[in-house]
């Protein structure tokens, strides 16, 4: 049975503290799954952003609200994306460029994001169609999806040309807390999760 320890959800442009030095926020998504969970991790000299939301103007406006009200006088110092899907890395380029800060991702996720962020509607190829047909997708549903496909590039800001590679079992020390990096697969090529034993907190992104 699932237990939900926090009854109050973050308001748009605001955070909820889930553990000392860990803030939870949400960004809206224009789909049936209507939001994404993101996090701020407090370091001694600034904040790490974990996942970014889609590359939409509305998302940037909500980030501006976060910057105005939730940083407690500290700057943003790094962006970490758990994986390459647009709702998780769509604003990474904008954030890194705005604050001149580094991007942290696993190798497989970074380079997949670089490739997929160049996709347009013209990249909906026969191989894509064959895959979904063989997976059993109904023809009418497939045609609807194809008609609405605009490519990752429409919702991903241009990614930085360099990044810090995250590898399985390494540790990041953020604000005196050691976060272990776990690399998963299935949902995406090399999905990053962060775990703090001291806080008993797992930031799992979309990894199940």
Each language-model region and where it sits:
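Conserved beta-strand hairpin/beta-sheet module of binuclear metal-dependent hydrolase folds
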Residues: 12-74, 194-207
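Divalent metal-coordination and catalytic microenvironments
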Residues: 21, 41, 51, 83, ...
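Metallo-beta-lactamase
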Residues: 47-57, 152-156, 161-164, 171-173, ...
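Short, solvent-exposed coil/turn elements at secondary-structure transition points
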Residues: 28-30, 109, 168-169, 187
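Short beta->alpha connector loops
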Residues: 29-32, 56, 84-86, 185-187
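Active-site HxH/HxHxD metal-binding segment of metal-dependent hydrolases
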Residues: 58, 64-173
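Conserved beta-strand segments of alpha/beta enzyme cores
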Residues: 23, 102, 178-180
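Short glycine- and acidic-rich boundary segments immediately preceding or forming the N-terminal edge
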Residues: 1-16
